[in-house]
Amino acid sequence: MKIALAADHRGHAAKERIAILLSEQGHEVLDMGTNSAKSCDYPDLAYPAAKAVADSKADFAVLICGSGIGMDICANKVDGVRAALCHDELTAQMSRRHNNANVLCLASDVLGEELMRRIVSSWLTTDFEPGGRHERRVRKMAWIEQGRDPALYDVDDGLAKDDRDADSR
């Protein structure tokens, strides 16, 4: 798989170690910076990596900053991105299995190197469970990206519930 990888200055060292892990696992790594521990702004790094996923230039992205929160918020501003801030293997697996997350965010100030490695490996080897409630919920997330209230729309037919009700009268 092609994995976009980015970090700010606080996540730089972890990014370098994760890049090695990904390469060892046979993934193509798109290193999108930063390339030093010099202070930088995480939105400048999160956006291009998330956009690479949204534009299908990367299959997934892994973003790292001190808390993981800034990267997560920025990535989730990009249409088509479902970024998940994960702190353990269970949240990594659930974000993929139930939410079809395509961007993994990590907190370098919180997680140790071995745990980060396990989270990344677990996240990349867990597949989405298509169909049923999880797929419906992911479609509802896409409605939100379009500025629509998912409670007002039938995601199976794309019609507003009021419109569907009017058609049945």
Segments predicted by a language model, with ranges:
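Glycine-rich phosphate/diphosphate-binding loop of Rossmann-like nucleotide-binding domains
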Residues: M1-Q25, V29
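C-terminal binding/interaction regions
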Residues: K2-G11, E89-R169
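Alpha-helical segments flanking ligand/cofactor-binding loops in enzyme cores
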Residues: I20, Y47, K51, I73, ...
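Short, structured coil segments at secondary-structure junctions
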Residues: Q25, V78-D79, N99
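A short beta-strand-loop structural module common to alpha/beta enzyme folds
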Residues: E28-S39
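Structural motif
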Residues: K38-Y47
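Helix-adjacent hinge/juxtasegments
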Residues: P48-L85
